Amino acid sequence: MAVKVPLGPTYEEMLYPNRQPLALREKARLARTHDELDPHNLFNITWKDDVGKVNSLVFPPELTGLDANIVVMLGKDFPSGSHKVGPAYSTLIEGYVDGDILPDRHTILGPSTGNFGIGVAYICALMGYKGVVIMPDNMSKERYQRIRGYGAELLLTPGSESDVILTLEKTHELQKDPANRALAQFELLPNYRFHRYVTGRSAIEAVQGIGNGRIACFTSAPGSAGTLAAGDEIKMAFPEARVAALEPYECSTLATGGLGQHRIEGIGDKMCTLIHNVLTTDFIVNIYDEETVQGLKVLRDGTDLLVQQGVDRDMAEFMRDCFGPSGVCNVIGAIKMAKYLKLGPGDNVLTIATDGFDRYHSVLDEMQHRYLGLEKHVMERWVKDVFLNADENLIFDVRRQEQKERLFAQKERDWLRFGYSREYLDSMKDMAFWNEEFARIADYDEKITRLRG
């Protein structure tokens, strides 16, 4: 007899949790505060709070020096502490309703550098699957602790964030065993579907009542590039919107082919991922990795300094837990793009904080060992250098056709070796490919609803 799997929300119910059946919604609210491993937490996979408002903040203008607004959607309130749980769930539930991923037959593989792996471990715990997370061996220790805490096995490959290609190679090797199924975030389209529909439409809601209520620019640093899919939906609502992909200056793969090591966990993985729709990426922006950690230190430990800068104390206190290095990277990129595009009063730049500070204590501990002293004047300088003085340098315009062809060629180099055909890769050069994949949401929602009964 087949093992019964706890079924979670449809895509529509992740976007609009108030459309979930009332009894399920009430159980999910209770589970959120009482039992992290209650399967009803699947219904808490949403950008929204209990009253239906998108979890977000307007980054203090006292730190940006801008007339434009920097609106930051907050991923820390998702189950497991990161929005990456959304694509992990979407990929698993699609596989389950298609009959391809079954808990009594298959082990789940989760290639990751951290947050997606945490999400995979968490979803496997809630839905009754055995999970194996494959990730580099030099990430923050909090990541490993969370994954093991959810009961998944860890399989570590050499290196750090920039060495994720080794995790992909290991994952493809393990997939030769028919008992293994990979939630392959870098290559499978549920990741794209979740972020285009759930994140993209939540972003459109997040700016309502702020400035002119529109989005002039969306910035996001790609790891898998799933989050960048939100830009496709943002452009449907606001055709004038620009999409900027951010990456570490030290690993400027998309901009210049750079393949160096860097400190920003979760992004900059030395590839053009398969699910990255480069057609809708307008700019690539390089961010210095050390500035993201300096900015994190300011937001975490510089509350009094921020208040002296004019930031409301309640906001300064709130922001202490809202960011990791990649979130700071996204804010820096948003400031740079606002200046580059010469945005003014009423204009909004929308960006994402993937997770919160809870998994980065060790990152700041390591920082303490690299600096002889972190006196007040040092952090005062960082406020200016990281945020207020973020400039328009290292911004690359990739809107011209020759730039698109360069990125397509890079994607071919990265993915032909993993068995994808040139014909399939060529199909991604047409927006029809992405729209057809997006349109599959309705079919999956119907399947999930039918199986849930």
Where are these predicted regions, by residue range?
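PLP-dependent amino-acid enzyme catalytic core
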Residues: 1-453
